[in-house]
Design a protein with these regions (language model features):
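Short, Lys/Arg-rich flexible segments
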Residues: 1-141
């Protein structure tokens, strides 16, 4: 037979479980966001370039259309970061570029009328799906 508890005990237990759930959520969001950031930087470094096309004095070879952008000066690569904040009972993760010219990362991700997309953020999220699924199972069972 189940042990009877008082309303006060029940509320304390509920509060404890609520705090643990929020801590677990924050851990999941923090680790997932960091992995997406790491993956975005890795896929840019490892992207396939087009040797038949060259731009600029240095002879920068852009990535093949549809692949993440190739690193040229490293501006985008160095600007990618993540942050996690807690608002009420939610842990919110953000991954993106803190570059001052906000059009640059967006133009690479989605393309322009003259340039095909070089997705870096969405490609990172796709690559991290299994990592996040396994992490979810590890944290939440």
């Amino acid at each position: 037979m189940a042990k009877a508890i008082s309303i006060d005990e029940f509320q304390r237990e509920l509060e404890r479980y609520s705090k643990q759930a929020l801590a677990d959520s924050k851990r999941f969001v923090t680790l997932s966001s960091a992995e997406v950031e790491r993956t975005a930087k890795t896929i840019m470094r490892d992207t396939i370039t087009n040797p038949d096309v060259s731009y600029g004095r240095k002879g920068h070879h852009p990535s093949v259309e549809g692949n993440p952008p190739a690193v040229d000066k490293g501006t985008l690569l160095q600007s990618i970061t993540h942050s996690v904040k807690v608002e009420g009972n939610e842990a919110i993760g953000e991954v993106g570029s803190i570059i001052s010219n906000s059009d640059y990362p967006r133009f690479l991700e989605y393309g322009t009328s003259k340039m095909k997309p070089r997705p870096w953020l969405s490609a990172s999220l796709i690559k991290c799906q299994s990592f996040m699924a396994n992490l979810w199972k590890e944290i939440f069972g």
